[in-house]
UniProtKB/Swiss-Prot annotation:
Functional description taken from the UniProt entry: Part of the SoeABC complex that catalyzes the oxidation of sulfite to sulfate. SoeB is probably the electron transfer subunit.
UniProt cofactor note: Binds 3 [4Fe-4S] clusters.
4Fe-4S among keywords: yes
Ligand binding ([4Fe-4S] cluster): C13, C16, C19, C23, C73, C76, C81, C85, C106, C109, C112, C116
Subunit comment: Forms a heterotrimeric membrane-bound complex composed of a catalytic heterodimer (SoeAB) and a membrane anchor protein (SoeC).
Organism taxonomic ancestry: Bacteria, Pseudomonadati, Pseudomonadota, Gammaproteobacteria, Chromatiales
Name of the protein described by the UniProt record: Sulfite dehydrogenase subunit B
Pfam families: Fer4_11 (PF13247)
Membrane topology according to the record: Peripheral membrane protein
A single Gene Ontology CC term: plasma membrane
Domain 4Fe-4S ferredoxin-type intervals: 4-34, 64-95, 97-126
InterPro entries: 4Fe4S_Fe-S-bd, 4Fe4S_Fe_S_CS, ET_IronSulfur_Cluster-Binding
Keyword Cell division: no
Amino acid sequence: MTQLALVIDLNVCVGCHACVTSCKEWNTSGWAGPLVDQNPYEGSPTGTFFNRVQTFEIGTFPNTETVHFPKSCLHCEEPPCVPVCPTGASYKRPDNGVVLVDYDKCIGCKYCSWACPYGARELDAQQKVMKKCTLCIDRITDAKLSERDRKPSCVLACPANARLFGDVHDPDSEVSIAIRERGGYQLMPEWGTKPANHYLPRRKTRMHIDPEELTRVDNPWRKEDLTDYTGEETLDDVAW
């Protein structure tokens, strides 16, 4: 069975939030094809997020690092949010493995959010239904779009190419190769949910930089023919 998913490279992500804003834009405008939900955020564009980027500082000062961690629905192969839904609103598509919510059936009971160990579901305070990442199901299944554009908006928007999209069950796909060759891992596999989304780990980069290289090559103060300061008053000494 096809299992579409995201692979996110934590070594490349710079935390710019382009994926977050593009997700908001796509899921509120619908400029290129029918949406599964015509207005997923209702009147408040700040309310519900399908995708978030969490930023952490790790290590002990002064040897610290900043880690940006994008997080959304992982489209698990064994999604715990599906069997707990009393109305059948939460379901997993058999053709591509994407986990979705039928808003017409959802009663906002939050059972799915309690069952999800990743905190990927949020209650839309205005529509009173649970919402989450859909992998831009309207884009990836829209035959009117070119193959290049049939990807989630967050993937297309990422300036660092930190987000990959494809079939993790296809061993020859871009995502499968990245997982295999670059040590891709699942988030909390001990829960037995078999998350389809994977992360590529951060890699330690060691380099030696000469102090001289930290100074801009076009810095005029590096010129040897500068006139020595005579001690006379200059504009820099004037209190404005």
